[in-house]
């Protein structure tokens, strides 16, 4: 398990919830499930965004299906993940791209 990041504070010492962007990937969204490469062994949160609606699955060897979580088009979401896992994506309607950013 990775060590939590130190919380950033404002001028009055109040915590500001913030994460630093790390490595990123772009995965094609199509009619077959596609996987990202394995996330870093320290990554526990990812930021995802797609230009099309799509289904997402997470795990060691995930396959996204039409019963998985739906990410609406042009929406940013953050998910907790297991270090070293992968993200799988499947189109909901049309083809596009899923952007994944490992947050630290």
How should each PLM-predicted stretch be described?
Residues 49-67:
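Short, surface-exposed beta-strand/strand-loop-strand elements in extracellular ectodomains
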Residues 43-49:
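Short hydrophobic/aromatic-rich beta-strand motifs
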Residues 29-34, 66-83:
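Short, solvent-exposed S/T- and G/P-enriched segments that are highly enriched in secreted/extracellular
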Residues 44, 80-98:
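Noncatalytic modules at the cell exterior or secretory-pathway interfaces
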Residues 1-23, 101-104:
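Short, intrinsically disordered N-terminal pre-domain segments
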Residues 27, 48, 56, 87-89, ...:
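Hydrophobic beta-strand residues in large extracellular and virion-surface proteins
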Residues 17-42:
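Surface-exposed ligand/attachment interfaces on beta-rich extracellular proteins
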